[in-house]
């Protein structure tokens, strides 16, 4: 039996359901497994809960290197109070609290296209590739995962993500439990497991069947396991689309984008320098929300250091995450990207 919700959680639950229409079954699972009062912001207007967001503590992983980050979910304003500019201050507060918690960056998936511009202008988020949509089955089969097994589906999914060297946002076991419980309960949403002869899970498939299209949102497993799992959707008479991780899907389909906002550029750059020892550069970085981060960031020989903000114009000026990412993309020869899927986003 679920523990009673706190007054704050009850307000969060009601506002989430009012704005997004999610079922009691999903919300009960989410609020039991994932929700935390200390990761939730609710704004009140004359005693009425009017704004809501949650900034979940998760990890960003690349080649086994991990960074603490926040993932922002369920950003919403009560319909009767929309258009009053209430959310901007809540987003700023979430970023400040995330930084105080030790998060290196904040990520989110805008629910609608117009929100990309809003999040950029409001608090400095930058768009990044999080997936590529393709119709190429060959491309999906070439994107294999490490060999992993789990007694349960959640155990397998947690293990295979952490074994992968792909740049990605990692699910916690609690988030995986909510995702795997809820996914097959929605109309047209299908979840399949692949098991070994010893009845261990070693693959999983998530896809959505629509009236005129099948969308494979995620598939996990070796190439051989993927081939077995994908037989069902690939034989459909409908158009079949597949989501690939962005770094492996370049040039084979249409990019899907999420957003990222740096909170600690020094630690983020050190993360990149560890992964890319040949990365070199110096950038004059400034941050309107976090002026203490202003400075000249120098990367060389796998080491990052920060000095005082330069008075000369000899260095590229980066006033936002987007501008710094553009400079890093030039230095690395490719755009930075992180796989982000099955985090409660709409398909």
What are the residue ranges of the model-derived segments?
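C-terminal functional modules
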Residues: 253-347
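Amide-forming acyltransferase catalytic core, primarily the GNAT-like/NAT-type
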Residues: 126-233, 245-250, 262-284
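Conserved active-site tyrosine of GNAT-family acetyltransferases
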Residues: 118-121, 125
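Conserved GNAT acetyl-CoA-binding A-motif
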Residues: 91, 98-111, 236-246
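Conserved acetyl-CoA binding element of GNAT-fold acetyltransferases
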Residues: 67-79, 212-223
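Conserved acetyl-CoA-binding loop-helix of GNAT-fold acetyltransferases
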Residues: 72-77, 83-98, 223-234
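Short amphipathic alpha-helix that is part of the acyltransferase structural core
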Residues: 1-57, 64-71, 138-175, 210-214
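Core nucleotidyl-transferase/polymerase catalytic module
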Residues: 41, 56-59, 73, 112-114, ...
């Amino acid at each position: 039996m679920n523990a009673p919700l706190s007054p704050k959680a009850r307000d969060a639950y009601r506002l989430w359901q009012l704005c997004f229409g999610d079922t009691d079954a999903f919300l009960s699972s989410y609020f039991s497994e994932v929700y935390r009062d200390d990761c939730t912001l609710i704004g009140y207007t004359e005693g009425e809960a009017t704004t809501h967001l949650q900034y979940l503590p998760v990890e960003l992983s690349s080649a086994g290197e991990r960074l603490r980050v926040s993932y922002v979910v369920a950003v919403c304003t009560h319909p009767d109070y929309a258009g009053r500019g209430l959310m901007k201050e809540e987003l700023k507060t979430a970023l400040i609290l995330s930084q105080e918690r030790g998060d290196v960056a904040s990520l989110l998936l805008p629910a609608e296209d117009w929100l990309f511009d809003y999040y950029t202008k409001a608090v400095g988020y930058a768009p990044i590739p999080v997936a590529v949509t393709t119709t190429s089955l060959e491309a999906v089969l070439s994107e294999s995962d490490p060999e992993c097994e789990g007694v349960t589906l959640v155990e397998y999914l947690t293990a295979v993500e952490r074994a992968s060297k792909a740049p990605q946002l990692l699910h916690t076991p609690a988030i995986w439990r909510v995702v795997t419980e809820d996914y097959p309960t929605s109309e047209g949403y299908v979840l399949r497991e692949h098991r070994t002869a010893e009845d261990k899970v070693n693959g999983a498939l998530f896809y959505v069947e629509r009236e005129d299209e099948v969308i494979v949102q995620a598939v996990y497993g070796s190439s051989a396991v993927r081939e077995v799992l994908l037989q069902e959707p690939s034989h459909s008479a409908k158009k079949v689309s597949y989501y690939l991780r962005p770094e492996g899907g370049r040039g084979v389909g249409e990019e899907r984008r999420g957003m990222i906002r740096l909170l600690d550029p020094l630690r983020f750059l050190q993360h990149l320098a560890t992964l890319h020892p040949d990365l070199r550069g110096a950038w004059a970085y400034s941050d309107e929300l976090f002026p203490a981060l202003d400075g000249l960031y120098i990367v060389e020989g796998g080491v990052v250091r920060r000095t005082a903000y330069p008075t000369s114009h000899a260095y590229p000026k980066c006033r936002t995450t987007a501008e710094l990412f553009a400079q890093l993309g030039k230095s690395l020869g490719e755009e930075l990207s992180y796989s982000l899927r099955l985090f409660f986003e709409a398909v």
